[in-house]
Amino acid sequence: MNNIYDTANQLAKEIQQSEEYMTYKIAKEAINLNFELKNKIEEFEKARYDAQIVALQTGKDDEAKMRHVQELYGELIQNQEASKYFDAEMKFNILIADINKIIGEAVQSLLK
């Protein structure tokens, strides 16, 4: 039987070689070269995070914060680089979520 750490290291390498990882990495590097766009994305991510925190703490969405997030996103996706970045980020996050789900299901009975 393989050492579980060897398997985990192999999984990490395969993630780094995946299309989702590579596409996200390239998109992120392109964003980092554009100072103005990078700042806009950071502003959007902070606004989205703040809106999520409020929703978690209060149990409801703050309409003004959500509207601000939507406005920022609407502006950003008009930019081709930003649109590619968000698409790549979403696909990478789906990959990681799927892997986490597989691992979670493997240990679920132990955690009950």
Describe the residue ranges of each PLM region.
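Terminal, compositionally biased segments used for targeting/anchoring and flexible tails
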Residues: 1-112
